[in-house]
C-alpha cells in the first residue's frame, strides 16, 4: 500500500474507487495498491 498525494492508475487493471472520502486504487497487482492521504 502506497500513500500518495496523487493516485493514478499504473496499469489497465487498476481501478480508482472512493470509499468514505478516501480515494483508493485497487489492482490485481499488489504493488499497485494506493491510497490518497
UniProtKB/Swiss-Prot annotation:
GO annotation, cellular component aspect: cytoplasm; ribonucleoprotein complex; ribosome
Listed InterPro entries: Ribosomal_bL36, Ribosomal_bL36_sp
GO molecular function: structural constituent of ribosome
GO biological process terms on file: translation
Signal peptide: none
This protein's UniProt keywords: Ribonucleoprotein, Ribosomal protein
Recorded family membership: Belongs to the bacterial ribosomal protein bL36 family.
PANTHER family: 50S RIBOSOMAL PROTEIN L36, CHLOROPLASTIC, LARGE RIBOSOMAL SUBUNIT PROTEIN BL36C
HAMAP family tied to this protein: Ribosomal_bL36
Protein name according to UniProt: Large ribosomal subunit protein bL36
Record organism: Mycoplasma pneumoniae (strain ATCC 29342 / M129 / Subtype 1) (Mycoplasmoides pneumoniae)
Gene of this entry: rpmJ
